[in-house]
Amino acid sequence: MKLKTTLFGNVYQFKDVKEVLAKANELRSGDVLAGVAAASSQERVAAKQVLSEMTVADIRNNPVIAYEEDCVTRLIQDDVNETAYNRIKNWSISELREYVLSDETSVDDIAFTRKGLTSEVVAAVAKICSNADLIYGGKKMPVIKKANTTIGIPGTFSCRLQPNDTRDDVQSIAAQIYEGLSFGAGDAVIGVNPVTDDVENLTRVLDTVYGVIDKFNIPTQGCVLAHVTTQIEAIRRGAPGGLIFQSICGSEKGLKEFGVELAMLDEARAVGAEFNRIAGENCLYFETGQGSALSAGANFGADQVTMEARNYGLARHYDPFLVNTVVGFIGPEYLYNDRQIIRAGLEDHFMGKLSGISMGCDCCYTNHADADQNLNENLMILLATAGCNYIMGMPLGDDIMLNYQTTAFHDTATVRQLLNLRPSPEFERWLETMGIMANGRLTKRAGDPSLFF
């Protein structure tokens, strides 16, 4: 395994695979904060060159956290299909990138090949891709999942309706749900971030969400994004169950910082299969985001792109209905400006799809970042072009509870009309019965929540 290269007469020597992976990243503030970023553009190019010549086996055999020390590493490594891996283990990362992007490589070819990839390999491919490569490659890798709606079908673009309220006021939550539905939002999930994380409040909010779903016979699923153990307890006590949510991290230490163990995720999957009101096979929902491991002091000297890819390796094990990166939510300490946020969003979507998960993105930023709503609009259009499964939707894109800026209900409608995309088929049929949509386009009734009263 070669760990050095020469560029313009200068020799660049790297100590191990972890350092090569880190220094091959495009510039981002989180890697600088962690002390793992390339010192110059020249060193970055050198690292990319070295990484491109490494084999799949080189990367797999050198995970950024040792197998013996980390349950996430063990899960990712143990899930590898050895037949798929043995076919590609001697390929260089450059050859794997070319294979993914080749017109001769089919959806089924990638579906088999991805079974042989560890998360570090997935990250390695993303690091030697341009933004256009990430978009083109993502488009080639549809991932379709079924709950009560079917998400990820090529030609569709879905939306999580996010009716958050600073007091968990159920009237406010219901009003936002009606407004979102009137714009055609909500086919991914109607998902509320609660202020208060207890069983009683969770049940009250779930009852509100499912009160609307049941009253209008809406083919979708609800979720209240409390801690996974709170959701499990509420569902076991009789609360209506849709998707079960948890934020995840790419290391065992990071999971512990979130108060999560793999056994909890195993239990969530079992409870969902037994109790939840889901027609399909997929009942879990995970959120991630570059920088989360570093913020928890749980990155073990690895860069944030590689740690994010490990989130997707963990998620893949549980076959979730939804996974999304909350790309700019963690703040400018990790993704400083619109350039870094856009790059991260494209990387995350590509890595999620190459990992085989139903990948969406919360196109967002915090109020102290060097970004604005144009960032969100740029990123959502790029991601929709890349085949992203879903984005978020809330009134005017302003989350007054979580205090960050995301995409609005009308943004999903804009993307669908701009790129000739549709909601999930079950949801579109319901929108047509309500007079909100006809022939794939919103009607004059759209955007008026009074149609529900």
UniProtKB/Swiss-Prot annotation:
Induction (free text): Part of the 17-gene eut operon transcribed from a single promoter, induced by ethanolamine and adenosylcobalamin (AdoCbl, vitamin B12).
Reaction(s) catalysed by this chain's protein: ethanolamine = acetaldehyde + NH4(+)
Binding, substrate: 160-162, 193, 287, 362
Cofactor stoichiometry and binding remark: Binds between the large and small subunits.
Domain of life of the source: Bacteria
EC number(s) stated in the UniProt entry for this protein: 4.3.1.7
GO BP terms: amino acid metabolic process; ethanolamine catabolic process
Phenotypic consequence of gene deletion: No aerobic growth on ethanolamine (EA) supplemented with cobalamin (vitamin B12). No phenotype during growth in vitro. Decreased expression of eutR during bacterial growth in vitro. About 10-fold outcompeted by wild-type in mouse intestine at 2 and 4 days following oral infection, but no effect seen during growth in peritoneal exudate macrophages. A non-polar deletion mutant does not grow on EA between pH 5.5 and pH 8.5, stops acetaldehyde release on EA plus vitamin B12. A deletion allows growth on acetate, suggesting BMC assembly or maintenance is impaired.
Binding residue positions for adenosylcob(III)alamin: 194, 246, 295, 401
InterPro entries: Aldolase_TIM, EutB, EutB_dom_2_sf, EutB_N_sf
Annotated transmembrane regions: none
Gene Ontology molecular function terms on file: cobalamin binding; ethanolamine ammonia-lyase activity
Broadest EC class assigned to this enzyme: lyase
Pathway where it operates: Amine and polyamine degradation; ethanolamine degradation
Subcellular localization, as worded in the UniProt entry: Bacterial microcompartment
Keywords per UniProt: Bacterial microcompartment, Cobalamin, Cobalt, Lyase, Virulence
Any one of the GO CC terms: cytosol
Cofactors (names): adenosylcob(III)alamin
Family: Belongs to the EutB family.
Subunit and interaction comment: The basic unit is a heterodimer which dimerizes to form tetramers. The heterotetramers trimerize; 6 large subunits form a core ring with 6 small subunits projecting outwards.
PANTHER family tied to this protein: ETHANOLAMINE AMMONIA-LYASE HEAVY CHAIN (PTHR39329), ETHANOLAMINE AMMONIA-LYASE LARGE SUBUNIT (PTHR39329:SF1)
Entry function: Catalyzes the deamination of various vicinal amino-alcohols to oxo compounds. It is spontaneously inactivated by its substrate and reactivated by EutA. May play a role in BMC assembly or maintenance.
The protein's name in its UniProt record: Ethanolamine ammonia-lyase large subunit
Organism: Salmonella typhimurium (strain LT2 / SGSC1412 / ATCC 700720)
Organism ancestry: Bacteria, Pseudomonadati, Pseudomonadota, Gammaproteobacteria, Enterobacterales
Encoding gene per record: eutB
